[in-house]
From Swiss-Prot:
Chain positions recorded as Mn(2+) 2 binding sites: 563, 565
Role this protein plays: Bifunctional glycosyltransferase with both alpha-1,3-xylosyltransferase and beta-1,3-glucuronyltransferase activities involved in the maturation of alpha-dystroglycan (DAG1) by glycosylation leading to DAG1 binding to laminin G-like domain-containing extracellular proteins with high affinity. Elongates the glucuronyl-beta-1,4-xylose-beta disaccharide primer structure initiated by B4GAT1 by adding repeating units [-3-Xylose-alpha-1,3-GlcA-beta-1-] to produce a heteropolysaccharide.
Protein's name according to its UniProt entry: Xylosyl- and glucuronyltransferase LARGE1
Organism: Homo sapiens (Human)
EC numbers, comma separated: 2.4.-.-, 2.4.2.-, 2.4.1.-
Segments on the Cytoplasmic face: 1-10
PANTHER family: GLYCOSYLTRANSFERASE-RELATED (PTHR12270), XYLOSYL- AND GLUCURONYLTRANSFERASE LARGE1 (PTHR12270:SF48)
Cofactors named for this entry: Mn(2+)
Principal location class: Golgi
């Protein structure tokens, strides 16, 4: 320590020299710039313009002064370089001193003593600034439960990833819903240097369920109290965040504050920015005990190792039991209990500067915390009103939040150069598959799309459905893009059963969809519709990937494989459930065909029965689907027979057959090599046939295709010759793969293709 401080004195002496040399020089020059008490300009031209006494000798003197000034400046620059080298060699007892250093404004915890010690020159740390190593992993814990909170977490994570320069390890205390959503999201996001671990929140309920809580977060709002018990025993420190947090700076700056903790300080918190704990918000307002204004727990720095040694579990439980005898319940969930503990043990807390948790609650005084934008580091939307909270600067905060809400998450897949990362099997396999492709191949983009991993957010809106107990339930499966959004309400009116939809959207479009859905009474009244967002990437519409995502996340034993442009007949849901029993789909390989028709009219009086449909067919109001452009697609359905059929009938597979079918949920997936327009359904029906599915046409079922503008992909198919060539190549490769997988049984498809 003596050597450290001796080096410090040398450093201070050198610094004083750096300051004194230019100061003395400028005093000399300044005094020499006066003649007879009047200022004399050092500029020869200015002097000549204003002084009649300008002479050649005085010009030489001033030129010599200017030369001397330049020499002094060169000496100063050299001295600065020496000082910077000396500072770089200065010994330090802090870890990671070779890495990036974050200098921060002090919090109030022991800050006066620290400043006094530095001024006195006898600080034990010699004024060393806190540091975070370049590749040090930052640990973040978040409690998340339910569908809405899962959406909020994504925005929080985006804001953290946008600014971060360090590896991150997220510890998510999640219920089964949030775990399913977020596990899929992070797995498909594939962000380098990010690790995610999940902890079952449902198993922790018994730890806090005995505490009555009036806060809107419910029982999950108390789970931060048990983090010392939940998180790994070898984890020493963690940043704990609420889901309604937005970062405006690098989280490493906050992580660096841990180095400022002293003595028994184990909690880093920002003071509450409302008068809640002062008890003067309304008459007879009785808050939980708190130190002054109390502290907000939206952002917490936890020293887990010290908390465990202090027996934190016992400490907060005893405090909660004692206070609940008088308070009966908590109003602000875990925050009330944290504050009650701090009231009794103020030495536990290190008060963070208020910009680490700028609170936008209903009664906030947070505007006193910041002066300009540069002061903001963390924004906390801690009001039930969220973005609708009243604040004179709320428009600025809202725009900052919306920036990350709509930010393209694919752009956050950037590498942290210079930091070794754990090998990710999925990422390595993807790179291997891509490296095997020939980039000079004219169909390279088509082939690449098959291996593209699209970021996926399951159950974007609240979903709640229990399949019927009789095991006949059927889910309608479809996929769509933003331009087909208007079909959702109509489909929901025609189909009362469960629906699974995969939506291909950008981040910004996902928010537009959210606003659209929340503004629709029809959609908000339905909780049995699963909306799964597959985020845009690449130039093709991944139609079969979308179908697979929607198929994979159904909870019923059967599914109706439809398309978003079709309206099913009224009552089709119940009719299909009866047909499942009638045709014994549970024990046989059958694909029930729903005959497809179309109209060219945007306003259609939808037929209520088969008789009405046949009448409209005869009048030319309806047509069999694609009869005029792609007859082969649905011709095997045998519409002539269907007109008079009263019982289900079997049809045989033919080339290019692509009906809409009802099958068991264990049927084969769609082949991902087919993207955009062409052969995506044909290939699937071919695979059903080779697996010996029977195609059964339902006599009293129908669906009608509604008119719409041509899609971008069909336009490319029609106008781009290379597109059609690549599609043909993919078809041939698919048929070859079928022959390899199914052998002799697949030969008929090659023959049928040659004859068609």
């Amino acid at each position: 320590m003596l050597g450290i401080c001796r080096g410090r004195r040398k450093f201070l002496a050198a610094s004083l020299s750096l300051l004194c040399i230019p100061a003395i020089t400028w005093i000399y020059l300044f005094s020499g710039s006066f003649e007879d008490g009047k200022p004399v300009s050092l500029s020869p031209l200015e002097s000549q313009a204003h002084s009649p006494r300008y002479t050649a000798s005085s010009q030489r003197e001033r030129e010599s002064l200017e030369v001397r000034m330049r020499e002094v400046e060169e000496e100063n620059r050299a001295l600065r370089r020496q000082l910077s080298l000396a500072q770089g060699r200065a010994p330090s007892h802090r870890r990671g001193n070779h890495s990036k250093t974050y200098s921060m404004e002090e919090g109030t915890g022991d800050s006066e003593n620290l400043r006094a010690g530095i001024v006195a020159g006898n600080s034990s740390e010699c004024g060393q600034q806190p540091v975070v190593e370049k590749c040090e992993t930052i640990h973040v814990a978040i409690v998340c439960a339910g569908y809405n909170a899962s959406r909020d977490v994504v925005t929080l994570v985006k804001s953290v990833l946008f600014h971060r320069r360090n590896p991150l390890h997220f510890h998510l205390i999640a219920d089964s819903i949030a775990e399913q959503i977020l596990a899929t999201l992070f797995q498909t996001w594939m962000v380098p240097a990010v690790r995610v671990d999940f902890y079952n929140a449902d198993e922790l309920k018994s730890e806090v369920s005995w505490i009555p809580n009036k806060h809107y977060s419910g029982i999950y709002g108390l789970m931060k109290l048990v983090l010392t018990k939940t998180l790994p025993a070898n984890l020493e420190r963690v940043i704990v965040l609420d889901t309604d947090i937005t970062f405006a700076t690098d989280i490493a700056e906050l992580w660096a504050v841990f180095h400022k903790f002293k003595g028994q300080q184990v909690l880093g918190l920002v003071e509450n920015q409302s008068d809640w704990y002062l008890g003067n918000l309304w008459k007879n307002h009785r808050p939980w005990p708190a130190l002054g204004r109390g502290y907000n727990t939206g952002v917490i720095l936890l020293l887990l190792d010290k908390l465990r040694k202090m027996k934190w579990e016992q400490m907060w439980r005893l405090t909660a039991e004692r206070e609940l005898m008088g308070m009966l319940s908590t109003s602000l969930a875990d925050q009330d209990i944290f504050n009650a503990v701090i009231k009794q043990n103020p030495f536990l807390v290190y008060q963070l500067p208020c910009f680490w948790n700028v609170q936008l609650s209903d009664h906030t005084r947070s505007e006193q915390c910041y002066r300009d934008v540069s002061d903001l580091k963390v924004i906390h939307w801690n009001s039930p009103k969220k973005l609708r909270v009243k604040n004179k600067h709320v428009e600025f905060f809202r725009n900052l939040y919306l920036t990350f809400l709509e930010y393209d998450g694919n752009l956050l897949r950037r590498e942290l150069f210079g930091c070794p990362s754990e090998a990710d099997v999925n990422s390595e396999n993807l790179q291997k598959q891509l490296s095997e492709l020939d980039e000079d191949d004219l169909c390279y983009e088509f082939r690449r799309e098959r291996f593209t991993v699209h970021r996926t957010h399951l159950y974007f809106l609240h979903y709640e459905y229990e399949p019927a107990a009789d095991s006949t339930d059927v889910t309608l499966v479809a996929q769509l893009s933003m331009d087909r959004l208007q079909m959702l309400e109509a489909i929901c009116k025609h189909w009362e059963g469960p629906i699974s939809l995969a939506l291909y959207l950008s981040d910004a479009e996902a928010q537009q969809f959210l606003r659209y859905a929340q503004g629709s009474e029809v959609l908000m009244s339905r909780h049995n519709v699963g909306y799964h967002i597959v985020y845009k990437e690449g130039q093709f519409y991944p139609v079969n990937l979308l179908r697979n995502v929607a198929m994979k996340h159904i909870s019923t034993p059967y599914m109706f494989l439809s398309d978003i442009d079709f309206l099913p007949m009224y009552g089709l849901y119940e009719y299909l459930r009866k047909s499942v029993i009638q045709l014994d789909l549970a024990n046989t390989k059958k694909a029930m065909i729903v005959p497809a028709f179309e109209t060219l009219r945007y306003r259609l009086s939808f037929p209520k029965s088969k008789a009405e449909l046949l009448s409209m067919l005869d009048m030319g109001t309806l047509f069999t689907f694609r009869y005029h452009v792609w007859t082969k697609g649905h011709a095997p359905t045998n519409f002539a027979k269907w007109r008079t059929a009263t019982t289900p009938y079997r049809v045989e597979w033919e080339a290019d057959f692509e009906p809409y079918v009802v099958v068991r949920r264990d049927c084969p997936e769609y082949d991902r090599r087919f993207v955009g327009f062409g052969w995506n359904k044909v290939a699937h029906i071919m695979e059903l046939d080779v697996q010996e599915y029977e195609f059964i046409v339902l006599p009293n079922a129908y669906m009608i295709h509604m008119p719409h503008a041509p899609s971008f992909d069909i336009t490319k198919f029609r106008s781009n010759k290379q597109y059609r060539i690549c599609l043909k190549t993919l078809k041939e490769e698919f048929q070859q793969d079928m022959s390899r997988r199914y052998g002799f049984a697949a030969l008929k498809y090659l023959t049928a293709e040659n004859n068609s």
